[in-house]
């Protein structure tokens, strides 16, 4: 126990060393209960977290604050500035609230476990992963800031008042967004105080930015960390003197050295063991390139939560938002942001009606236009850096530094330019060998399951084709089960994988009897307070139950094996304690068949129609299956797209496989042209080749008949007019003869 306590004291969290008093440390295993994703990134997520014996539901929404060109800067041994190469994630920062507590706030990072702050109206809890831990264990602790007398700001000195605000609702803001781009400099002493580890310090500055962001949510402001600078070995300016002197010294330095790094505000964060001042800025000068700066003094008596309040107050002052006169201003909570006491209080802090009015006044003026610049906040935000070993935008290749490149067996890439060597087509990839593309038809990703499909090199790309698999809902496992995401969700295999030989999927009576008991033997879920019962229609989707026909006792690590005799059959199941990382093994897997046209989904037996399985065997001429793109994957010797034509010796596949049919197929088959530079382009081309074309031969057959008919009509017309002319001439001649034969008087 003593070792564990020392370990906990060394963990990095929302506070540094003795910044704040931790009350009783609690341990919890957060449970994810909801998640919504977009583009492979969770945009909304909810967790159940146990705090002081009570469960709370925390709802979170992604809150990005790093721009696409974000960089961390340091200095080389010669004193020249250089970018520091570190892995950053811009998609694992969230902001939200605790369900049922309208005046709550949650600021959480999920990059490595849950790390952040849970703020109720007047109390804050820190949460961070327990390291090392086998499971998803976290520790939760209440943060109680220590009292301190350092609360005076140089540019706007305000008397610290102990009188309470008059509480009144604040009018809502108009629905528009503003953005503050912030450059932060961490001086040497603070870098050491935060752990003297670049990764740890960066993580804490990210947390600080997230906390500051949460404060400005009510004003529809997003605080962007545009860039970060670490003074690791030495400070670039003296950091002695009071905050006012340091502020003028810093803005003078920033005018010369931060010209090329865009920002609305630049902050110097300085560590002081004790200080009468905790910050300084120029009031109302945020968008001024000469005076848009501030200094925050981080003393040993404040937490990261308190430092976020200091940053928020400095940003507010720089927008012309003064401290509150608590005799005139109204606060929607106990303490508002622009009260010096906010630095030493826990819980959610909002802006008073005076602050809102001052903010609206500031953004109505032309000098606030810098806040309307919306940075690009892509999750993939890093600019390309040649030599870091990762191929980024604008690079053909990147083998690392010159030494690493020279050590490779095939030198396909020029280390200095990140371009291919002359004559090289590739340097890495499943379909690249000796700097050249592997010929078409080579299997680059073999199938791993009867519901998975081979992918092949296409001969024109270093990348293997996109992973494709049999369409969800296709029967498998001797037509007893269904394919889901390239895996046959086979109940028999689930039992074998856990219990080994001698086991099989339990019959219906085992599920009906045991999973309706709502105890260790069978249930539809485990919570911190007990079991979730199975309804009669969901009994086959709760605890996984298997039959066992051997006499040996089964042992499963960290689990209890439950035995039951049901109508002469031994039915067995597992039980893990709540929060165990392997507890998913004791449930029937999603996608397992639970009835006619029904499958298990989230421990419920639901209609399988949501899989949208629509592959009729006749679509592929009974010679193939549909893949997840709903294209036919043909059996060997049959050609896509519809498996209608044959080509003896061809291994089979689809228009998505990469092994497109040969350029000269057997007689009777359609002709193919081998064109394409990438897997996607080639797929489009082949699909167009196979697309049916309108029949045109009747048109060409009709043309000769049409010409003959036209000639015939022209001839008849000519004959008609010729004969008419002859008749007219004959009539005229007859009249002349008749007149000549008449007697004269």
From Swiss-Prot:
Expressed in which tissues: Expressed specifically in testis.
Residues making up the signal peptide according to the UniProt record: 1-16
Disulfides per UniProt: 287-370, 329-354, 331-336, 444-457, 615-626, 620-632, 634-643
Disintegrin domain residues: 383-472
Chief place where the protein resides: membrane
GO function term, MF aspect, one: metalloendopeptidase activity
Region annotation Disordered: where it falls in the sequence: 654-674
The keyword Transmembrane is assigned to this record: yes
Domain Peptidase M12B residues, every copy: 178-375
Keyword Nucleus: no
Post-translational modification: The signal and the metalloprotease domain are cleaved during the epididymal maturation of the spermatozoa.
Organism superkingdom: Eukaryota
A GO biological process held by the record: male gonad development
Pfam families assigned to the protein according to its UniProt record, in alphabetical order: ADAM_CR, Disintegrin, Pep_M12B_propep, Reprolysin
Role noted for this protein: Sperm surface membrane protein that may be involved in sperm-egg plasma membrane adhesion and fusion during fertilization. Could have a direct role in sperm-zona binding or migration of sperm from the uterus into the oviduct. Interactions with egg membrane could be mediated via binding between its disintegrin-like domain to one or more integrins receptors on the egg. This is a non catalytic metalloprotease-like protein.
Protein name: Disintegrin and metalloproteinase domain-containing protein 2
Gene name as annotated: ADAM2
């Amino acid at each position: 126990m003593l070792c564990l306590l020392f370990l906990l004291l060394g963990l990095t969290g929302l506070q540094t060393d003795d910044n704040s008093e931790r009350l009783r440390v609690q341990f919890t295993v957060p449970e994810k209960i909801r998640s919504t994703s977009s583009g492979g990134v969770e945009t909304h997520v909810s967790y159940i977290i146990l705090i002081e014996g009570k469960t709370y539901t925390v709802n979170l929404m992604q809150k990005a604050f790093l721009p696409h060109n974000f960089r961390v800067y340091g200095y080389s041994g010669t004193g020249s500035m250089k970018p520091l190469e570190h892995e950053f994630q811009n998609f694992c920062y969230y902001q939200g609230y605790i369900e049922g507590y309208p005046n709550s706030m949650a600021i959480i990072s999920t990059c490595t476990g849950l790390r952040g702050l849970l703020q109720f109206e007047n109390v804050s809890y820190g949460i961070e992963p327990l390291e090392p831990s086998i499971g998803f264990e976290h520790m939760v602790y209440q943060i109680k800031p220590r009292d301190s007398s350092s609360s005076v700001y140089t540019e706007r000195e305000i008397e610290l008042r102990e009188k309470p605000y008059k509480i009144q609702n604040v009018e809502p803001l108009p629905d528009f967004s503003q953005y503050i781009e912030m450059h932060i400099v961490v001086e040497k002493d603070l870098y050491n105080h935060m752990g003297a580890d670049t990764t740890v310090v960066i993580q804490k500055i990210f947390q600080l930015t997230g906390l500051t962001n949460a404060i400005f949510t009510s004003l529809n402001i997003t605080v962007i960390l545009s860039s970060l600078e670490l003074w690791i070995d030495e400070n670039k300016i003296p950091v002695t003197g009071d905050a006012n002197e340091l502020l003028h010294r810093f803005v003078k330095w920033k005018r010369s050295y931060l010209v090329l790094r865009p920002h609305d505000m630049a902050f110097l964060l300085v560590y002081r063991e004790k200080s009468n001042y905790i910050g300084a800025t120029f009031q109302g000068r945020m968008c001024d390139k000469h005076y848009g700066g501030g200094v925050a003094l981080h003393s040993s008596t404040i937490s990261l939560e308190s430092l976020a309040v200091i940053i928020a107050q400095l940003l507010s002052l720089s927008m012309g938002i003064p401290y509150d006169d608590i005799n005139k201003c109204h606060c929607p909570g106990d303490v508002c942001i622009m009260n010096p006491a906010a630095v030493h209080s826990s819980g959610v802090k909002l802006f008073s009606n005076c602050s809102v009015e001052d903010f609206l006044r500031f953004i109505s003026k032309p000098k606030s236009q810098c806040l309307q610049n919306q940075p690009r906040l892509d999750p993939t935000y890093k600019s390309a850096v040649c030599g870091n070993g990762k191929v980024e935008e604008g690079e053909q290749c990147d083998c690392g530094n010159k030494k690493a490149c020279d050590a490779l067996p095939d030198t396909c890439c020029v280390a200095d330019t990140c371009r291919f060597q002359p004559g090289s087509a590739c340097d890495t990839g499943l379909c690249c060998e000796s700097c050249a593309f592997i010929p078409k038809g080579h299997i680059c990703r073999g199938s791993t399951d009867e519901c998975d499909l081979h992918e092949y090199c296409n001969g024109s790309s270093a990348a293997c084709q996109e992973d494709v698999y049999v369409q969800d809902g296709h029967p498998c496992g001797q037509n007893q089960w269904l394919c889901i995401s390239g895996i046959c969700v086979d109940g028999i295999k689930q039992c074998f994988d856990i219990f080994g030989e001698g086991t099989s999927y339990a019959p219906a009576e085992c599920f009906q009897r045991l999973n309706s008991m709502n105890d260790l033997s069978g249930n539809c879920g485990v919570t911190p307070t007990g079991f979730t019962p199975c309804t009669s229609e969901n009994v086959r989707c709760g605890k996984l139950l298997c039959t066992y026909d051997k006499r040996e006792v089964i042992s499963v690590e960290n689990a209890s094996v439950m035995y039951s005799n049901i109508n002469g059959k031994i039915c067995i199941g597992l039980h893990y304690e709540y929060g165990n990382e392997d507890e998913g093994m004791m449930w029937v897997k999603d996608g397992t068949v639970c009835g006619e046209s029904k499958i298990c989904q989230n421990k419920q037996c639901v209609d399988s129609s949501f899989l949208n399985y629509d592959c009729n065997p006749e679509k592929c001429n009974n010679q193939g299956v549909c893949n997840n793109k709903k294209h036919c994957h043909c059996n060997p010797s049959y050609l896509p797209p519809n498996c209608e034509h044959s080509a003896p010796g061809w291994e089979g596949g689809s228009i998505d496989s990469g092994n497109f049919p040969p350029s000269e197929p057997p007689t009777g088959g359609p002709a193919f042209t081998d064109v394409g530079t990438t897997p996607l382009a080639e797929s489009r081309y082949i699909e167009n080749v196979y697309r049916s074309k309108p029949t045109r031969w009747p048109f060409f057959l009709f043309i000769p008949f049409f010409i003959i008919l036209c000639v015939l009509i022209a001839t008849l017309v000519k004959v008609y007019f010729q004969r008419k002319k002859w008749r007219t001439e004959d009539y005229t001649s007859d009249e002349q003869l008749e007149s000549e034969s008449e007697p004269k008087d």
